[in-house]
């Protein structure tokens, strides 16, 4: 069982975003930063060196973007949560984004094995004029092998706050078995995805652009977050939801910052 910790602090120096502080304990590790989009946007890749999460693991991450910094954080590979040994596996993530800073939190998908027990909690605290774009893609069972999520449990809790006020609170729970088949659960799908953007106002034209993609899976798009956007996906294709979320990310970059997004090179193995 692992008790892994990761701490990252970003600061601005000479108009560049730098990682000012790194503290990591196994199995968590961070690659050296990349700057494919210029010095004020730091691409960061988090690795899980053990290859997967097992019952009893507790992984904690604390990430702080100081004022006027910009970062993109992704993972080196898909996450895996293995069948439980009777204990719950946990992942706890706290993110603080100071004034005029922005973070794109774009991890690769997580695969929840049949019989896994996993609980994750993500909290984001935003400063004034700061922005957040994050997604979560979760596959239940190794469906490529014919495996379904027939036993186990998955809990996900997202919280996004600004100045002590909640902007987005989302709690999900899925138990293996009948909830996979039911319409209020996965409707016999294997995969769900959520993308949340909070920053600048999102107009109807942008909403229509995001909706204007042909998907086999079910999807929903709304801007009821106020200055933000919410996208949901339920289906069976990892490639489809990744492509859609990637296109939404690129549209938001173009519309909100007048800048073309550059794909992190670790994604080229998708």
From Swiss-Prot:
It comes from the Bacteria. It is found in: Cytoplasm. Pfam families: UreD. Required for maturation of urease via the functional incorporation of the urease nickel metallocenter. It comes from Microcystis aeruginosa (strain NIES-843 / IAM M-2473). One of its GO terms (cellular component) is cytoplasm. GO terms for molecular function: nickel cation binding. UreD, UreF and UreG form a complex that acts as a GTP-hydrolysis-dependent molecular chaperone, activating the urease apoprotein by helping to assemble the nickel containing metallocenter of UreC. The UreE protein probably delivers the nickel. This is Urease accessory protein UreD. Its main location: cytoplasm. Belongs to the UreD family. Keywords: Chaperone, Cytoplasm, Nickel insertion.
């Amino acid at each position: 069982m692992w008790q892994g910790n990761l701490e990252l602090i970003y600061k601005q120096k000479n108009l560049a975003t730098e990682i000012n502080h790194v503290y990591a304990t196994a199995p968590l590790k961070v690659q050296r930063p990349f700057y494919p989009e210029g010095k004020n946007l730091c691409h960061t890749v988090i690795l899980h060196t053990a290859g997967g999460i097992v019952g009893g693991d507790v992984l904690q991450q604390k990430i702080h973007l100081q004022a006027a910094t910009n970062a993109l954080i992704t993972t080196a590979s898909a996450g895996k949560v293995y069948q439980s040994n009777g204990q719950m596996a946990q992942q706890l993530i706290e993110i603080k984004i100071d004034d005029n800073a922005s973070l794109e939190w774009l991890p690769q998908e997580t695969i929840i094995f049949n019989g896994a027990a996993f609980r994750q909690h993500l909290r984001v605290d935003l400063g004034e004029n700061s922005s957040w774009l994050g997604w979560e893609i979760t596959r239940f069972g190794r469906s490529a092998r014919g495996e379904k999520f027939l036993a186990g449990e998955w809990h996900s809790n997202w919280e996004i706050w600004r100045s002590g006020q909640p902007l987005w609170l989302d709690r999900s729970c899925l138990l293996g078995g009948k909830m996979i088949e039911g319409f209020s659960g996965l409707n016999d799908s294997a995969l769900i995805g959520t993308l949340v953007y909070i920053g600048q106002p999102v107009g109807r034209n942008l909403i229509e652009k995001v909706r204007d993609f042909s998907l086999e899976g079910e999807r929903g798009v709304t801007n009821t977050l106020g200055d933000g956007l919410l996208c949901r996906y339920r289906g069976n294709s990892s490639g489809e939801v990744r492509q859609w979320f990637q296109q939404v990310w690129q549209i938001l970059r173009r519309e909100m910052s007048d800048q073309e997004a550059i794909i992190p090179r670790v994604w080229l193995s998708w």
